[in-house]
């Protein structure tokens, strides 16, 4: 499912006014930029057939950076507003002048898109994620009667960023991140051992919630647990 767009210049600030302010702030600096970020994350943990935790978090803010010679000044705030930006500007203006200003060329405009603009958090309904974790638990217990405990977790996050420079160059990026972990404990003759497996990356949640993928994680976690159970002291 597509990512809900983070639009700092439509939601919080006037773009032209902000660009003018940035140029004024950095007029005596060698380099610098204005950075906006919004991040949302969700995690669910099922432990021993019970949903133990479910967390949803979100944050946003901006950072203003100026470089002059070997000195760097940085100001940031979780409040994206003109008032907060002006306060940050006052901090940046305290940067001592290095005398001769040397202009730094901006990064290349040729950028390779690495991630799809997706939001893995809203890709699946909350109830479907809970059902998935329960299915993982049931599947693990059905593989081996020695399984006494299963812990499964799924996490997803998305980071939206905007970078504004003084040359009117405006860049944005979306960075999704997903993770699925499985931990299995087996017990035999009073001895208990645990094995874990999982995977994730900057891609859609569906790539790791596919049965062929998560079953592989379960089997690997079980293999490690059984291997530990059968291990003998050196």
Question: What do the predicted segments below correspond to?
Answer:
Residues 1-234:
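Active-site bordering "gate/hinge" segments
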